[in-house]
A protein has these predicted regions:
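Serine/threonine-rich low-complexity intrinsically disordered regions
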Residues: 72, 80, 147, 157, ...
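Intrinsically disordered or highly flexible coil/loop and linker segments, enriched in small
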Residues: 95, 146-147, 179-183, 222-226
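Hydrophobic transmembrane alpha-helices and their helix-loop junctions in integral membrane proteins
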Residues: 1-157, 169-171, 177
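Glycine- and aromatic-enriched alpha-helical transmembrane segments of multi-pass membrane proteins
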Residues: 162-175, 203-226
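Membrane-interfacial helical/loop segments at transmembrane boundaries in membrane proteins
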Residues: 102-109, 181-206
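Acidic/proline-rich low-complexity IDRs
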Residues: 1, 193-195, 212
Length: 226
């Protein structure tokens, strides 16, 4: 919740890490061990991408972190902006990105295992995450510059900084397909190494409902941020 009102670029990302770690612990707590590990795996990609993007913004603005002073950076930093948006969509849980599959798998297991309270908190948290991440995106890259002197000299970062952003963004998009590979995808692969049996079965109707609800909640969060 601290990220909802914070204006420090790096602190918002740091606070978001806490909630994502919470999802991992929820996964383990409800018996969805492979889902928790999958979220750890996907989180490494999108959080690495987000922090590198924030570093690119800092480089362009001489270390400035206050997003209330930014705005209008999209036209000056298209690569950074687009890769930042990929990371934000990922952490918000928008399909078909991997963050959607890993987070929704955890929430689905929480629901079908009877932990409805935990599922509800996780779903609300997903909406909050979408809100504060896109609040950051809109304040940083869109609208008019709120500090014209700060923004007027901004420029895209050099290739040595933007190439890793592109590689991570493309890699992260490809990681999303790990969830839908044959034999259970990533989770099926992890399950082979787990001795403990996971809880939760295959409930197609419930799964479809939960997926739709999760996406709607995330889109509402993005809409409120806009």
């Amino acid at each position: 919740s601290m990220a909802l009102v914070n204006n420090d670029l790096k602190r918002i990302l740091a606070y978001s890490t806490v909630s994502q770690l919470g999802y991992m612990f929820v996964g383990v707590g409800v018996g969805a061990y492979s889902a928790g590990i999958f979220h750890l795996f996907t989180h490494a990609f999108f959080k690495g991408l987000l922090f590198l993007c924030s570093g690119s913004v800092m480089h362009a603005l001489h270390g400035e972190l206050d997003i209330q002073k930014m705005g209008g950076l999209y036209d000056k930093m298209k690569i950074t902006a687009l890769t930042f948006i990929v990371g934000a969509l990922a952490i918000a849980g928008i399909p078909p990105l991997a963050g959607f599959w890993s987070k929704d798998s955890i929430l689905h297991h929480a629901y079908v295992s009877g932990h409805r309270g935990i599922w509800l908190v996780g779903t609300i948290t997903a909406g909050m995450t979408a809100f504060y991440m896109f609040r950051l995106i809109f304040l940083t890259f869109f609208g008019k510059p709120r500090d014209k002197h700060l923004v007027e000299h901004a420029h895209e970062s050099p290739l040595i900084m933007t190439i890793p952003l592109i590689v991570l963004a493309i890699g992260y998009i490809l990681v999303g397909f790990a969830a839908i590979l044959p034999n259970g995808g990533f989770e099926g692969f992890v399950n082979k190494a787990l001795v403990l049996r996971e809880v939760g079965g295959h409930h197609e109707e419930e799964a479809s409902f939960l997926i739709i609800l999760s996406v709607v909640v995330a889109l509402i969060g993005i809409g409120i941020a806009y």
